[in-house]
């Protein structure tokens, strides 16, 4: 049944992607300025709550020059109020991500966060057929970067800038790239909070890009998504990512994305005080 739904989705992906993206832009333009920052395709500068443990599982139906599925499971740890650690696997390779939030500014119904991050993907696979630096577990990659996130009322925007490098590469394609994203999120429900147990509905539009430092190509993807949060702990995401600009030879450049997250508060032991 899932395969049938995905086939219908891909047959209509051009019309659906343009229509969905246009709908979200229209909604963002006409609703009051409000915010949310739990992005579907990128990470904000805000770290996980201290002493929390999160688990995430996602499924991607990917298409383009070829079709394939990608399953991914990740464990997330809020080591402190400033440091988060993520460990993940796509069952063909493993990755680690650490984030350090070094700046925080809070105001009434608003805040600003700045963070550094580092990421490493390790796999036996080698994507020698593409010039792009792939971040979905198809090749071993290391990277570092910077994230700036600002929230105001129920609207949040985030900018990330990073450098990524393949561990193995072909001389014909190069080895490193400049990675960037610009993400926006809007909380559309509830209109007014009465408890932490209320269901939240968020809409997102993210731009995800890469410029090869060898000068041999670049891409820019758009990724609209909808998100539901239950009891401030469980999160269901549904998104679609597609290419706006494609000047690399990626084998897959569009995907239907579904993920489920669950967060356990105060799951890690408190630090002992001397």
List where the protein language model places each region.
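Cleavable N-terminal export/targeting peptides
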Residues: 1-41, 265-274
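Transmembrane beta-barrel domains of Gram-negative outer membranes and organellar outer membranes
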Residues: 35-159, 163-167, 172, 177-274
């Amino acid at each position: 049944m899932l395969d049938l739904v995905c086939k219908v989705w891909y047959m209509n992906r051009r019309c659906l992607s343009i229509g969905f993206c246009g709908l979200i832009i229209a909604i963002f333009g006409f609703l009051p300025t409000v915010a949310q920052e739990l992005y579907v395709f990128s990470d904000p500068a805000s770290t996980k709550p201290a002493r929390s443990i999160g688990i995430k599982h996602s499924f991607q139906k990917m298409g383009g020059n070829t079709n394939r599925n990608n399953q991914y499971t990740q464990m997330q740890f809020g080591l402190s109020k400033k440091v988060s650690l993520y460990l993940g696997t796509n069952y063909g390779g493993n990755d680690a991500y650490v984030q350090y939030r070094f700046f925080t500014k809070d105001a009434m119904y608003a805040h600003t966060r700045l963070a550094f991050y580092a990421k490493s993907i390790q796999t036996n696979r080698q994507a020698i057929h593409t010039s792009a630096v792939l971040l979905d577990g198809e090749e071993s990659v290391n990277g570092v970067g910077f994230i700036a996130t600002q929230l105001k009322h129920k609207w949040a925007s985030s900018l990330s800038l990073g450098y990524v490098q393949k561990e193995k590469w072909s001389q014909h394609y190069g080895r490193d790239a400049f990675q960037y994203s610009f993400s926006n999120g809007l909380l559309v429900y509830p209109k007014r909070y009465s408890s932490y147990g209320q269901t939240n509905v968020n809409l997102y539009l993210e731009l995800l890009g890469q410029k090869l430092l060898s000068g041999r190509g670049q891409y820019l993807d758009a990724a609209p998504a909808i998100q539901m949060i239950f009891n401030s702990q469980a999160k269901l995401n549904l998104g679609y990512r597609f290419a706006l600009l494609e000047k690399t030879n990626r084998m897959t450049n569009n995907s239907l994305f579904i993920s489920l997250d669950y967060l356990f508060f105060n799951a890690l032991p408190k630090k002992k005080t001397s």
